């Protein structure tokens, strides 16, 4: 704009700060972490859903078969539901991230949306993992103060499946923590430096 236009009363319009291009390595790491989240979610759900074991229980009233399955515990059902949502979420967000891979500039709003949803899902998965871990620990060790006996010596296969599922879901929560760091860092790098 020339000085002549300014003198005639034309007010210069403020320009928005330039949007910094996103580093491609962050996009690749984001997609890889989302695929890892999908794999961990599927593996944990499969381990939990296949954790059924039937044993003959002897009691003073006779012996009968008794099945241990994940549906008997609300904590395990919550874990399966949370990880199913995490798996679906990882598919959707991986596709969104892949669609923005070829674009030179990614809108900051996308990073905000991903960051908020990643944090929300991290809370859900971490709560489900902790809840299932608490129930699993009582099944493993029992609680002598309230006379809850351990079940690991009777339902060993069931306990192994549940334990492996909880460990893999803990890995899924760690992947979500890394996704939060990656998206927060990507958003931070886009803040204009004055």
Swiss-Prot record:
Compartments (UniProt record): Cell membrane
Alphabetized UniProt keyword annotations: Cell membrane, Membrane, Transmembrane, Transmembrane helix
Pfam families: CASP_dom
Topology in membrane: Multi-pass membrane protein
Intervals, Extracellular compartment: 49-75, 131-161
Cytoplasmic-side positions: 1-27, 97-109, 183-194
Cellular component terms (Gene Ontology): plasma membrane
Segment forming the signal sequence: none
Entries under InterPro entries matching the protein: CASP/CASPL, CASP_dom, CASPL
Regions crossing the membrane: 28-48, 76-96, 110-130, 162-182
Keyword Hydrolase: no
Assembly description: Homodimer and heterodimers.
NCBIfam families from the UniProt entry: A_tha_TIGR01569
Family designation: Belongs to the Casparian strip membrane proteins (CASP) family.
Record protein name field: CASP-like protein Ni6
Native species: Beta vulgaris subsp. maritima (Sea beet)
